[in-house]
A protein has these predicted regions:
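Intrinsic-disorder/low-complexity linker and hinge segments
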Residues: 15-17
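Catalytic glycan-binding domains that act on GlcNAc-containing polysaccharides
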Residues: 19-129
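Sec-dependent N-terminal signal peptides
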Residues: 4-13
Length: 129
């Protein structure tokens, strides 16, 4: 019985976190590309406006974890793979799943500053309402 309770509690925790990422991802996609998976702005492309450096960082994280999976620059145009990269990036740099940190990380990278990401953070929070 104890094992069942632990499994159910763990499932609820994962489910709640996934629901939070869904809201965050939808808001970021709205701010970044107005929901357009073909959007291009300089070297940022796709639904979440992913830069080549993020793809490289995701592949480094995967390699560090012992995974053979790798993302390509073309994967930035794929909404499913873009979301996977977002979740992977967050799991590495934001393991507690803090929503504010997730938004700021996406805008400013792993060395973000609060001041430098404030306008973006405010836009995404407004889009979440």
């Amino acid at each position: 019985m104890k094992r069942i309770i632990i499994i159910v509690a763990f499932s609820i925790s994962i489910s709640a976190q996934a629901r939070d990422w869904g809201r965050v991802l939808k808001a970021i996609a709205t701010v970044e590309s107005n929901g357009n998976p073909r959007a291009v702005c300089g070297d940022q492309v796709g639904l979440l406006q992913i830069r080549p450096i993020l793809v490289k960082d995701c592949n480094r994280i995967l390699e560090k974890r012992g995974s053979n999976k790798r993302y390509t620059l073309r994967d930035r145009y794929n909404p499913v793979k873009s979301r996977e990269m977002f979740v992977l990036y967050q799991s590495h740099y934001n393991p507690k799943g803090n929503i504010e940190r997730a938004i700021r990380l996406w805008n400013g990278g792993s060395g973000y500053s609060v001041r430098g990401t404030q306008k973006y953070y405010n836009k995404v929070r407004r889009a979440m309402k």
